[in-house]
Amino acid sequence: MSFSRLLTPRILLDTTAVFPPSSSVVAPSLSRQLRCTRTGGSPPAPPHRLVARRAMSNGAAEPAIYGGGGGAQQAASSAAARRVTLATLRGKHRRGEPISMVTAYDYPSGVHVDAAGFDICLVGDSAAMVAHGHDNTLPISLDLMIEHCRAVARGAARTFLVGDLPFGSYEASTAQAVGSAVRVMKEGGVNSIKLEGSAPSRISAARAIVDAGIAVMGHIGLTPQSVSALGGFRPQGKTVESAVKVVEAALALQEAGCFAVVLECVPAPVAAAATSALTIPTIGIGAGPFCSGQVLVYHDLLGTFQTSHAKVSPKFCKQYGNIGDVINRALSKYKQEVETQSFPGPSHTPYKLAATDVDAFLNALKMKGLNVAADAAADAVEYTDEKEINGTPQLKVYA
């Protein structure tokens, strides 16, 4: 079978095994929108989409010494580009165009992801590992996830933002799930949420969140929040039974109204089957090339070499940079220049007293009996007036 055919969604399985004809399950509006679009009909208007995240900065320009602009300026600049919406993603999927997705966890990474033109940016609970040094994703709280979402939203004005619901924020009941999702949307400023798993309670949670007007991305295969039950970070769908369950789980999430499903660490044929069976996009991570799109963790693909995360750096991740080496070299050079007093030199000591005020300042110090301080100030005046010679600052001692 050709690659292009695998990217064209087709129904391969007997879905009555999951949703029999007599089932009372009705696909929510988001799923219907996707079906209408794929069959050439006119889809309803996109579901509720928060735009508050695009103006989460206080809007005040930062002082000129910091370069001005700040988050508001960045957001305004990025907003000039066409914003990615669910309609954008549906269109790409309908045309068979791959969907690009990557994680981000703070304002700088949000800016980078937005500038690179990604379709989707996931503010993942993997922040627990790559940003906070934990061995898994479980410790991060809902409040902390919201803060990460807010930071990314300030920097990413164009890309479609997805916020993870962290472990412990949606398992107890559908009411808890909806409440957590509403908080992530309203306070975090994202466009949608992602939840893991396909157990009946998770399907109910997904359906309830969609019914509340919030777009939901599903996540099956290796679900990191279930690491204790899975016995570690292990690939899923490697037996016939578990492979079929992956496809059935994807179908169940689609019927619950999810607009896309992440397939993590499953064999490529399993991902291909799920992709072909669905009418919504699949996003692969360690699932081969036959998904509708791909996602990787920001720190993994950039090679930042976070020590805590390096222990579990995934085999499927291609490293596109050695940012960790660049950072280490820059930090080492800075430390060396501080210790050798070659930084800051005159070119990085920009703030001066007006020439007419120098003598008055020195005399004022001497009048207060601060002669040593006056001598130090005079030395500094002479130093900052010097030019750098061959890259080495020349200190002229005040006489």
Curated annotation (Swiss-Prot):
It catalyses: 3-methyl-2-oxobutanoate + (6R)-5,10-methylene-5,6,7,8-tetrahydrofolate + H2O = 2-dehydropantoate + (6S)-5,6,7,8-tetrahydrofolate. Residues 1-90 form a transit peptide. It holds the Pfam family Pantoate_transf. Its cofactor is Mg(2+). The active site is at 264 (proton acceptor). Binds 1 Mg(2+) ion per subunit. Pathway: Cofactor biosynthesis; (R)-pantothenate biosynthesis; (R)-pantoate from 3-methyl-2-oxobutanoate: step 1/2. 3-methyl-2-oxobutanoate binds at residues 125-126, 164, 194. Keywords: Magnesium, Metal-binding, Mitochondrion, Pantothenate biosynthesis, Transferase, Transit peptide. Its EC number is 2.1.2.11. It is found in: Mitochondrion. It is an enzyme of class 2 (transferase). Mg(2+) binds at residues 125, 164, 196. GO terms for biological process: pantothenate biosynthetic process. One of its GO terms (cellular component) is mitochondrion. One of its GO terms (molecular function) is 3-methyl-2-oxobutanoate hydroxymethyltransferase activity. NCBIfam families: panB, PRK00311.1. Catalyzes the reversible reaction in which hydroxymethyl group from 5,10-methylenetetrahydrofolate is transferred onto alpha-ketoisovalerate to form ketopantoate. Belongs to the PanB family. This is 3-methyl-2-oxobutanoate hydroxymethyltransferase 2, mitochondrial. It comes from Oryza sativa subsp. japonica (Rice). The lineage of its organism: Eukaryota, Viridiplantae, Streptophyta, Embryophyta, Tracheophyta.
